[in-house]
């Protein structure tokens, strides 16, 4: 039975690496996975999922206005899809998460979503909020803070490396702008 999975974590826990390994596993068995990534995330170029360890694979792009149900049902009608892999799923809209549940429930295709749970303010992204509510399986991928504890928060830094508490929820950046830390060091960095 197909299910929807949400693999979530702070930054630098290996979400994209895990997605690419899943894609490889499907292809190794002669199956066809389809990978999507957010068009807004162009850190490593467009139309690619890339991991920090050097793996990468081409991906379909999605943006907030895309109807993923229509897109995937047409793709599936053209050539059978065995699995849908979504990178940067925190950028999905509520409606897109619902559309992905339709892919699972009506087309019987597993959907594996990988993304951040919360932003630099400690607030849920919309995509993450609805995946936490509607996914069949929730899987936390772990990374570590500089102190050795589990990192479950993300700090956004300015150019001088100081923690920022305000700003737009979405600002694309990598290790130069964001650091994963434990809750204790998150609060300390923000002076709370």
UniProtKB/Swiss-Prot annotation:
Subunit structure: Homotetramer.
SUPFAM superfamilies, alphabetized: Glucocorticoid receptor-like (DNA-binding domain), P-loop containing nucleoside triphosphate hydrolases
Transmembrane portions of the chain: none
Pfam families: TK (PF00265)
Catalytic activity as recorded in UniProt: thymidine + ATP = dTMP + ADP + H(+)
Active-site residue numbers: 88 (proton acceptor)
A Gene Ontology molecular function term of the record: ATP binding
EC number: 2.7.1.21
Cell compartment(s), UniProt: Cytoplasm
Gene Ontology cellular-component terms listed: cytosol
GO biological process, one term: DNA biosynthetic process
Superkingdom as given in the UniProt entry: Bacteria
Alphabetically ordered keywords of this record: ATP-binding, Cytoplasm, DNA synthesis, Kinase, Metal-binding, Nucleotide-binding, Transferase, Zinc
InterPro entries: P-loop_NTPase, Thymidine_kinase, Thymidine_kinase_CS
The family this protein is said to belong to: Belongs to the thymidine kinase family.
Positions of ATP binding: 9-16, 87-90
HAMAP family: Thymidine_kinase
The name this protein goes by in its record: Thymidine kinase
């Amino acid at each position: 039975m197909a299910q929807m999975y949400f693999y979530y974590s702070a930054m630098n826990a290996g979400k994209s690496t895990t997605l690419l390994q899943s894609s490889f596993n499907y292809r190794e068995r002669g199956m066809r996975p389809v990978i999507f990534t957010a068009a807004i995330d162009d850190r490593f170029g467009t139309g690619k999922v890339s991991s920090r360890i050097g793996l990468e694979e081409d991906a379909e792009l999605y943006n907030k206005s895309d109807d993923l149900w229509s897109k995937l049902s047409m793709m599936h009608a053209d050539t059978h899809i065995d699995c849908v892999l979504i990178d940067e799923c925190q950028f999905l809209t509520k409606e897109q998460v619902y559309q992905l549940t339709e892919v699972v429930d009506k087309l019987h295709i597993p959907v594996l979503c990988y993304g951040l749970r919360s932003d630099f303010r400690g607030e849920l992204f919309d995509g993450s909020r609805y995946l936490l509510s509607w996914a069949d399986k929730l899987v936390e991928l772990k990374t570590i803070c500089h102190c050795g504890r589990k990192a479950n928060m993300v700090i956004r830094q300015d150019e001088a490396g100081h923690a920022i508490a305000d700003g737009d929820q979405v600002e694309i950046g990598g290790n130069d702008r964001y650091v994963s830390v434990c809750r204790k060091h998150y609060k300390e960095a923000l002076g709370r």
